[in-house]
Amino acid sequence: MGLFLNKIVIPGYFSHLRSMVGSLSRGISRKATLEYYAQVADEETAKAVDGWTCKSEAEKSVALFEEISFLVHKIIVRCLMGQDFYDHHVRELYDLLRTMEANVGSIWHTVLPGWVAHGPARRLWRCRQRVQEIFDFRLRERERSPEEWKKRLDYISYTLQDPATAHLSRFYGAHHTLLMFAAHTSTVASISWILLEWKSPHRLQRLREELATHALEQSPFLDALVKETGRHYSGNSDVRWARKPKTLRTEVASVPESRITIPEGTIVSISPYLTHHDPATWDNADTYLPERWLADPDLAKKMNEGGQLRYIPFGAGSHRCPGEKMAILIAKIAVARIVQSCDLAWGEGSSENTLGGLDFSKVGSPWLKGDVQVRFQV
């Protein structure tokens, strides 16, 4: 699906991709920025918990992934776009994101030329245009009071002052559309799957006790939960074009020392999900086991030693996700706030036996097919 993301950005954006990504790496990794993001994530999660637990008895059952999806979206909009986008456009931007998610992977993008106005293409074009209109309007509004926004910590305020990106404001809408895709799906999956894994009372109690005595960033078990969720449920595919021929050795038991040559120009897809479930690499590969990270705190580093990439929830090398710190921070804060505030119970018609399979249709880690109804209880 990542091959079709060019359908949701305006022409010319990818010519400036390197500048935009460089600005992102700098802008969201500053200490003050991460502290602000942590505050936003905690505030939004607290508001969400209040809403979930204050519903009337008949309305308490909610769709878990859908609820976490809107929560993460609100955090992303406040952190990356700013309070003005949040106050005026947060719901509309969410609806636009969902429409784009539903249409970006259409088979028609593959079998028809890019200029053919088929249904999914038209819907993507309309969404792209509306996002651009929102950004054009909000940036004009900011120009009226530049001093008010100069010291803000949202990412747009940074890019407007960064010499590498200040002159590229016409591409901000496209840039943030891609960021919504990149930051949203996998963060939602991380939080939601951790919450579903609460079915182990021992793990839930252990996390609560640890959070009661440790600062969030010093909680080994919370860190282990995030790492194991990234291993067990990671599904984003890394797609690359081979720039030159490359010969690789393949480990096929029936063909010793077998090799394969990848021709120049070949599209190569790497599956973190299959890598993370390889029994030759991981003990109990198909079992969700956060304790593995407590038994060996250096496990992530060891898995990628010697040029081997066996743990890649955020990619690797020059293609490693620049938003890794932000995504982990949001996931940890959301989980910590929820686990310290309420319990999670099955909702109407849902149980462990009714859970569907994994939904790999999104850009990022898989969600649960059909979602699941849950109740957040004080």
Swiss-Prot record:
- InterPro entries attached here? Cyt_P450, Cyt_P450_CS, Cyt_P450_E_grp-I, Cyt_P450_sf, Cytochrome_P450_monoxygenase
Per the UniProt record, one Pfam family is: p450
* Binding annotation for heme: 321
Disruption of the gene: reported phenotype? Abolishes the production of most pyranterreones, but accumulates high amounts of pyranterreone 5.
Its required cofactor(s), as named, are: heme
Q: What is its EC number?
A: 1.14.14.-
Molecular function (Gene Ontology), one example = oxidoreductase activity, acting on paired donors, with incorporation or reduction of molecular oxygen
Q: Which UniProt keywords apply?
A: Heme, Iron, Metal-binding, Monooxygenase, Oxidoreductase
Q: What induces it?
A: Expression is positively regulated by the cluster-specific transcription factor pytR.
Pathway entry: Secondary metabolite biosynthesis
Matching PROSITE patterns: CYTOCHROME_P450
The Swiss-Prot or TrEMBL record describes its family as follows:
Belongs to the cytochrome P450 family.
Q: What does this protein do?
A: Cytochrome P450 monooxygenase pytD; part of the gene cluster that mediates the biosynthesis of pyranterreones, a family of antioxidative compounds. The first step of pyranonigrins biosynthesis is performed by the hybrid PKS-NRPS synthetase pytA that condenses 4 malonyl-CoA units ato the acetyl starter unit by the modular PKS of pytA. The acyl chain is then connected to an L-serine through the amide bond by the modular NRPS of pytA. A tetramic acid is formed and released from the PKS-NRPS pytA to give pyranterreone 5 with the help of the thioesterase pytI.
Q: What is this protein called?
A: Cytochrome P450 monooxygenase pytD
